[in-house]
Design a protein with these regions (language model features):
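Short beta-strand or tight-loop elements
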Residues: 35, 59, 101-102
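Residues in well-ordered beta-strands of folded domains
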Residues: 24-26, 38-40, 64, 98, ...
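Small/polar-rich, solvent-exposed N-terminal microdomains that initiate assembly or binding
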Residues: 1-53, 71, 75, 82, ...
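Acidic-leaning, charged glycine-interspersed low-complexity segments
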Residues: 82-126
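Oligomerization/assembly interface segments of phage tail-like spikes and tubes
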Residues: 55-68, 73, 113-123
Length: 126
């Protein structure tokens, strides 16, 4: 699922036009150019009651859209939402937006803007 999600986001022109290949699981590399995306698995569990048969899992994936300005972060979040909401393909049985929030990330040194979205990802495990 992780590989498929990252590859899909990098392949969508509306997303890659803003971040190129700057889509990373966990944390962005030190000194990462903005804008960029980080992806985090918040939870992941098998779905035992699936009509799709064994091997279906459901993950909550947090997608953080980082940018130098709020407008850039919001534009990136809209591109990601358009790409991911209701997407299915390959191992991904379905992806759906669960929540979104705007969060500043002010460490006192640099001002970075962030829009965070949680997606429910149903996928075929294994």
């Amino acid at each position: 699922m992780e590989e498929a999600l990252r590859a899909m986001l990098r392949a969508v022109p509306a997303v890659s036009g803003l971040v190129a290949t700057r889509v990373d699981w966990g944390i962005a590399p030190q000194g990462q150019v903005l804008p960029c995306l980080t992806l985090t698995v918040v939870s992941d569990a098998p779905v035992d009651h699936s009509l799709d048969g064994p091997g279906l899992s459901q993950a909550r994936v947090q997608v953080d859209c980082w940018a130098a300005t709020y407008a850039q972060a919001k534009a990136l979040s809209r591109a990601v939402r358009t790409a991911l909401d209701a997407w299915q393909g390959g191992v991904i049985a379905g992806a759906f937006l669960a929540s979104a929030r705007d969060l500043p990330d002010d460490d006192g040194v640099t001002e970075i803007h962030r829009v965070t979205m949680d997606f429910i990802i149903n996928y075929h495990f294994g």
